[in-house]
Amino acid sequence: MASTVRRPVASLWIGERLHYLNQLCLLSHVKLGHPTTLYCTEKISNVPEGVTVRPATDIMSIDMEIVKQTSESFLSNVFRYKMIEKTNAVWIDCDAFCHRPFPDEMENIFAGHGFRGALNCGVVYIPQKGELIFQLLDYYQNLPDAPAWFNKQQRKRIEKQESHLPQAVRIYNAERTAFGPQAFTWFAQQTGDFEKALTSDYLYPVPFQLNDVFFDPYGRVEGHFTDNTLSVHLYTNGTKPWWRKNVPLSNSYAARMCAEMGVNPAEALEE
């Protein structure tokens, strides 16, 4: 393990067991000297050594009924900014591999991804007391009838939702990403922080649309990297079922990184 103690990072897990890709990504931050905390909604059986486990309620109360009606990602979208506000740690998704340490002096850590140019919030640090985090938290805590950026079609989808449903569920059912990249992009534009975004090669060097390359033994994943690259997003929400249920092929990026970090994929496959 690296002897240098770097800035803290943290994430959230909802469930009882990590997949090997999540173990790999968490451990990669530990190995590079980042104090790494995993906030959990329940006890997890296979957290890698070196990761600090804390209850998610250290950051906020958890309404699991809302999660059941939306998704785990909905909760994480609210949680990440509350976590930053409370702890000043860098938020990392559990499928973000640490390629190089996050510089201590970097005050804004976020970037666009894929081919659309919208900001992603899979790896995020923004100032604890800035206008951007204030507007994001205000949005989540005081949900509007419809997000300001919604078009007529999206607004109609909200109106079609049953009125007795929680507003978070109604918005989620109308647009699944309304609490994640859409919200982050919109509010960053309103506050002027959009211009502070890093280029995609820093945090999302491989576009989401090409995520199979991590499992291809002949894929040139590193060909996407630049000298700027700090994090490599593995996009497990888009990983094909075969790769989730089977060990990665020898010489693929996933297999090589597991060997480097000491992770045994066979012990943490999707069942």
Predicted stretch roles:
Residues N77-A89:
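Small-residue hinge/turn detector
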Residues M1-S76, C94-E271:
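Glycosyltransferase-associated regions of secretory-pathway enzymes
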